[in-house]
Amino acid sequence: MYKKRLPVLTGMLALMLFSAACSSRSEKVVDLDGNSYNIVQIGSMIWTGKNLVVEHYRNGDAIPEVKDPEKWATLTTGAWCYNDNKQENGNIYGKLYNWYAVNDPRGLAPTGWHVATDAEWSILSLLLGGMENAGSPLKAASLWKEQKSDGGKKIGFEALPAGARRDTDGKFMLPGEYSRLWSSTESNVNSAWCRSLGYFDAALRRGMANKNIGFSVRCVKD
């Protein structure tokens, strides 16, 4: 009986120990287009507190918006879209980017910041109690399907169920149920590491995704 409870207790203890090191900060970071982002400190890392919405790389070059599903599915260069190609979704959930935009040498993140690496996501997960528990404190307190109060501490990360855009046909996973977030770390020639959260549990899952899928993006201060 005690052995079965140990992983749960360990996760709870880790969350209690490190929640003190998690805090929203009064400063904001501003991207090239003038969009501002709240920031949150988790351990020694400082993260953006909402999904990226920028439309230009750091050098000023425009990132193309691609609405056409067939074109999206065959892209090998950076692009963004709104979920379901509706700006009102972007106003709430931010933009979806393919990994080619994440990896573009012109820079997707604001100056002095970078798109979170796979290693940084893994550290974040450990700080918040491990994969099975880390999603709960990261999630926003609203907009998730079947949202129920879990009594957990929210830390200002405000992960939203922004959905995703598929690589096979360019169609959308609509908002409300899932958050998919890129890392900047390639896993192989066709895919990169990512993280996912679902409405149905508290996990922050690690996985690989094809590079022309559209996911949300979070940044970490250099």
Describe the role of every protein-language-model region.
Residues 2-11:
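Bacterial N-terminal signal peptides that target proteins for export
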Residues 20-21:
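C-terminal motif of bacterial Sec signal peptides marking the signal peptidase cleavage site
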Residues 24-222:
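Conserved positions within compact, well-structured domain cores
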Residues 13-17:
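Hydrophobic core
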